[in-house]
């Protein structure tokens, strides 16, 4: 978190000499009367008192300024007792590292391993304890491609692995409404595409929102990361329902697909 530091500009009041000598080459100084001595003595005492007060105020200001500069204030401290993790690295308590055959992956710490096999070549599946709609899977299949770009653009690649998004189960006649084409009860929209290169290896990343006519969960956010290495196609897919996506599941889905690395 960015720390707020306070800086105090200290200014020392300028002091001017209160006494000036008046002399004359032709006259001697006039004798000082007793009442004049008393007045001058009082002025000197007042000046000393003021100087002491100023010194104390300056000392206090210096101490406060030093404390402010030396203390880093975190906005989340008062409310939560710890710094907020905005735009920071993932906390170790939120993700655990999984090492599989030829790949490494960050898995949400609160998700459990699942034995359900949903896709060809699936070697791993984890799902949310409370909602199995939120899950991730890793698939490793043989390929004759040398690089992920050999599949064409990311959109072309997605069309070749569209089984990852689920198949339409109903093929009856339907009207064109609710954003669905005629006779279609499912739709998929690509929200984001990226082609990052990590350690000299190119990846495809796609964010897809799928919806079905039954309105289940308001749709599903499905994130796919894929690359090719040593004659194998590696795909990591993670998803969450639209409602849970905006209630905290997003960081787990994005974290899983963003931090997969293939040897």
From Swiss-Prot:
Listed GO cellular component terms? chloroplast thylakoid membrane; extrinsic component of membrane; photosystem II oxygen evolving complex
Compartment annotation: Plastid, Chloroplast thylakoid membrane
Pfam families with a match to the protein in the record: PsbP
Q: Which domain of life is it from?
A: Eukaryota
Disordered: region residues: 14-34
UniProt transit peptide range:
1-78
Q: Where is the composition biased (Low complexity)?
A: 14-30
Q: List the disulfide bonds.
A: none
The induction annotation reads: Down-regulated in response to mixed metal ion contamination (cadmium, copper, lead and zinc), but not in response to zinc ion contamination.
Per UniProt, the keywords (alphabetical) are: Chloroplast, Membrane, Photosynthesis, Photosystem II, Plastid, Thylakoid, Transit peptide
Give the primary localization class: plastid
Among the record's GO biological process terms, what is one?
A: photosynthesis
Q: List the Gene Ontology MF annotations in alphabetical order.
A: calcium ion binding
* Keyword Lipid metabolism set for record: no
PANTHER family the record matches = OXYGEN-EVOLVING ENHANCER PROTEIN 2-1, CHLOROPLASTIC (PTHR31407:SF6), PTHR31407
**Role description:** May be involved in the regulation of photosystem II.
Q: Say which family it is in.
A: Belongs to the PsbP family.
This chain's protein is named Oxygen-evolving enhancer protein 2, chloroplastic
Q: Which organism is it from?
A: Helianthus annuus
């Amino acid at each position: 978190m960015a720390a707020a530091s306070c800086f105090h500009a200290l200014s020392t009041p300028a002091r001017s000499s209160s006494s000036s000598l008046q002399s004359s080459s032709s006259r001697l100084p006039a004798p000082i009367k007793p009442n004049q001595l008393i007045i001058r003595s009082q002025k000197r005492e007042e000046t000393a008192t003021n100087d002491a007060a100023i010194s104390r105020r300056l000392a206090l200001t210096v101490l406060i300024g030093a404390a402010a500069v030396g203390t880093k204030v975190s906005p989340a401290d008062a409310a939560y007792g710890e710094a907020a993790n905005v735009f920071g690295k993932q906390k170790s308590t939120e993700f655990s590292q999984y090492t599989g055959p030829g790949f490494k992956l960050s898995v949400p710490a609160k998700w459990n391993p699942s034995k359900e096999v949903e896709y060809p070549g699936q070697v791993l599946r984890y799902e949310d304890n409370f909602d199995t709609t939120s899950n991730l899977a890793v698939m490793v299949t043989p390929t004759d491609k040398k690089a992920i770009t050999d599949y064409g653009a990311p959109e072309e690649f997605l069309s070749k692995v569209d089984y990852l998004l689920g198949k339409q189960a109903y093929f009856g006649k339907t009207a064109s409404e609710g954003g669905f084409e005629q006779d279609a009860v499912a739709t998929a929209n690509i929200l984001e595409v990226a082609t990052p290169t990590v350690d000299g290896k190119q990846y495809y990343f796609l964010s897809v929102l799928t919806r079905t006519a039954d309105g289940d969960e308001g749709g599903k956010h499905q994130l796919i990361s894929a690359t090719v290495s040593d004659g194998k196609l590696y795909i990591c897919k993670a998803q969450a329902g639209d409602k849970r996506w905006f209630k905290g599941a997003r960081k787990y889905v994005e974290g899983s697909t963003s931090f997969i690395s293939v040897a």
